[in-house]
Design a protein with these regions (language model features):
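Outer membrane beta-barrel transmembrane domains
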Residues: 29-168
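Loop-centered beta-sheet repeat module
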Residues: 1-27
């Protein structure tokens, strides 16, 4: 994880963030397709398609460039961010021995992704008022809007989120 804020002046901050996420391999029963046309493999044990399969995920990379403007009172902030995330295909293998009649590569389809997003947000904080002993608790409310600009194997959905934080 790398994160750094560059404070241009008392009101404007630029931020850079990048991180790599490694997921440990996991093994569980999975329905393995027989061939590339088998989009709904059988879940019945007697059909022989349910196997103990280990998934080895690729490393996920995330990065973000952002800018924040803090109003003079310190209570309000607005920000914008550009986000890029990418992950290569996961690899699947039978935990004992791959059955040659099954299509293990089919489990990897659609596990890779790339996404470009934009985010804008507004924050209200009582921290300056709390420090000045004018408010009873340090709290913060964030409202943000995130929209997907482009992507592969990812949702094209936009979302709105509101976070309420109380520090103690």
């Amino acid at each position: 994880l790398f994160f750094h804020d560059y404070k241009l002046n008392k009101n404007i901050t630029f931020g850079l963030m990048t991180k790599a996420v490694y997921n440990l391999p996991d093994t569980r029963k999975r329905a393995v397709p027989r061939d590339e046309d088998d989009s709904l493999p059988s879940l019945l044990a007697e059909d022989g398609q349910v196997r103990d399969v280990t998934r080895r995920q690729s490393i996920d990379f995330e990065s973000e460039i952002s800018s924040t403007y803090t109003f003079d009172s310190g209570e309000w902030e607005i920000w914008g961010a550009y986000q890029y995330n990418e992950s290569a295909k996961d690899h699947f293998e039978d935990s004992s021995e791959n059955d040659p009649s099954l299509y293990y590569q089919g489990l990897s389809e659609g596990t890779d992704f790339k996404e470009l997003s934009a985010e804008v947000g507004l924050t209200y904080s009582t921290i300056p008022a709390f420090v000045a002993k004018k408010f009873f608790a340090p709290m913060q409310i964030d409202a943000l809007y995130n929209t997907r600009i482009n992507g592969t194997n990812t949702s094209k959905a936009s979302y709105v989120r509101v976070d309420a934080k109380v520090y103690f």
